[in-house]
Amino acid sequence: WDRLLYGVGELLVFGPLKNTLGMSRVRVAYTAGEAIGPELFDFYRSLGINLKQLYGQTEAAVFVTMQSDGEVRSETVGAAFPDVELKIAENGEVLYRSPGVFQEYYKNPQATAETKTPDGWVKTGDAGYVNEEGHLRIIDRAKEVGKMNDGSMFAPKFIENKLKFYQYIKEAVTFGDQKDYASAFINIDLDAVANWAERNNITYGGYQEIASHDKVRGLIEGCIMEVNENLAADSHLRSSQIQRFIILHKELDADDGELTRT
């Protein structure tokens, strides 16, 4: 019965959608570079696209980790390649070592010394950890990751991207580095929240009024609670659950120096 349903779905929905995406003949696909969100990864997998994640650098002779068949996870980049060693530095940065790593940067000994330790470990510049299954999970760039007062990892961009996955949240700024708990500034997406308000018979006069509405606060709080549930399931990030948040009464604006242009 499940195969029959999938066959109908492939004919009517999945097949045409894959064709629109130009992926109807793809047998296997890999994503690398900056990690895509697990929700987007799961979306492509749900279409029947054999999407996998890998992690590598030119300095590593390409691969450091890769997902193999039967070991695909939406939030990790796979286990270490054969003969590749992984190590997590005290600041959370991922280091690797293997017979295939680069010898040096051409005529640039300073850059070589900054990237490669005397005993052969290569600094990736990325923060992450190896989970119980031996799979590497990349959280963010190491320079963007801080620490809570309890010593646990705090990755603001990682949390902000999870918040902005919700249609009602346009921008999010999180705080937690060297603090006892995490907090957030939230910008609502006016169009999405306005549509929600109309469906729920909520009247308002402008951005400030709808942003301060109690029911809108409840809506955003529900999104934050879902993000917190996800963080709570991760032993490395559970201290980063958002304890307090403020919905801003104006949109963050590059003209006011609150956002960059890109």
PLM region descriptions:
Residues 146, 171-173, 226-262:
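Conserved C-terminal "lid"/linker of ANL adenylate-forming enzymes
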